[in-house]
A protein has these predicted regions:
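Short runs of predominantly hydrophobic/aromatic residues within well-ordered alpha helices
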Residues: 28-36, 241, 269-274
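Major-groove recognition helix of helix-turn-helix-like DNA-binding domains
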Residues: 60-78
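Charged phosphate-binding loop/patch that engages nucleotide di/tri-phosphates or the phosphate backbone
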Residues: 9-10, 269-292
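Basic, low-complexity segments
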Residues: 1-22
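A short glycine/serine-rich beta->alpha loop
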Residues: 19-24, 58-59, 261-266
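Helix-centered, glycine/charged polyanion-binding patches within enzymatic domains
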Residues: 171, 176-259
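DNA-recognition alpha helix
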Residues: 46-61
Length: 292
């Protein structure tokens, strides 16, 4: 499996446009990305991937960058652009549908960690320290938009940021925690995007004296009218996002947890991005689909 994923990543990189660097480096941006993905595929730190003995025999002849070089180059704008281009090529849906789900998945770390950028907040039926991936997911498992934030960051705030730029339309289905006038307004501004969620405090509570978003009133009408079968089916199908998150973790090399060498937001974002790419490659059989 590791070699199939590696060959698929190499095939995709070969199809991407790679602008020339103004500075001559010993190792190209593509070389840096390949070494990085070799580490991520095997769930190993960068110091492991830069050692020749950890590569197949037929790939050991090529020189490898040092650990210091990897750390420095991964922060450069050109390498980050190539990582983003790889994500856009593989992860972003090519034919967006009309049904989308939104939720968050906790990425907990040790409570003793010194990571100052991690937050302490709600995880799965408990409190934990770490980060959380927020994602808008289609029914086929494709991810239209995602963000990584500290565990204590409000899911509704992250949802607003994703909705502003996500290439989606139709229905965005969420649990009651996403019931927010600001989020409904963000969906309205996108046009042809309706947030469907139950009221946060239940149908027996009023809407208060403040002005309500027309999108929120529409969601209340959909979920609380005498015949709410359509909204009920949408909310029932929202459970599919739990299986999508499960598919990120239930295979060797998936996004199971954050290893000890992945700390601070920059490294966590880069690690999660690579895991999303690998999961999409695995799902789409990229070794044959993306070859030019």
């Amino acid at each position: 499996m590791e070699h199939q994923l590696w060959n698929a990543i190499v095939a995709v990189l070969a199809t991407l446009d790679k602008p020339r660097n103004s500075v001559a480096f010993e190792f190209s941006d593509e070389d840096i990305v390949k070494v990085f993905y070799w580490a991520v595929i095997h769930d190993r730190p960068m110091s492991w991937a830069v050692q020749r003995r950890n590569w197949p025999i037929h790939l050991r002849k090529k020189p490898l960058p040092s650990n210091t070089t990897m750390s420095r180059r991964l922060r450069t704008e050109s390498v980050r652009a190539l990582l983003n281009a790889l994500e856009q090529r593989v992860v972003v849906p090519q034919q967006p549908g009309l049904f989308w789900m939104i939720d968050g998945k906790p990425l907990s770390i040790s409570g003793c960690s010194k990571d100052k950028q991690a937050g302490y907040g709600r995880a799965a039926n408990c409190k934990a320290k770490g980060y959380k991936i927020h994602a808008i997911v289609g029914s086929d498992g494709t991810i239209a938009s995602w963000r990584v934030a500290p565990m204590n960051k409000d899911e509704r705030v992250m949802a607003e940021r994703m909705v502003r730029t996500a290439p989606i339309q139709g229905y965005l289905v969420a649990d009651s925690n996403y019931d927010s006038n600001k989020l409904h307004e963000a969906c309205l501004k996108r046009d042809q995007l309706q947030l469907v969620t139950r009221r946060r405090y239940g149908p027996n509570h009023g809407t208060g004296h403040r002005k309500q978003s027309s999108g929120r009133l529409r969601a209340i009408e959909l979920t609380e009218n005498p015949k709410p079968a359509f909204a009920t089916n949408l909310l029932h199908d929202r459970d599919e996002i739990e299986r999508c998150f499960g598919n990120l973790t239930n295979w060797g090399g998936g996004l199971t947890c954050l290893p000890p060498w992945v700390r601070t937001h920059r490294r966590v974002h880069r690690w999660v991005q690579a895991k999303l790419v690998l999961t999409a490659v695995k799902r789409a059989d990229c070794s044959t689909t993306y070859v030019a």
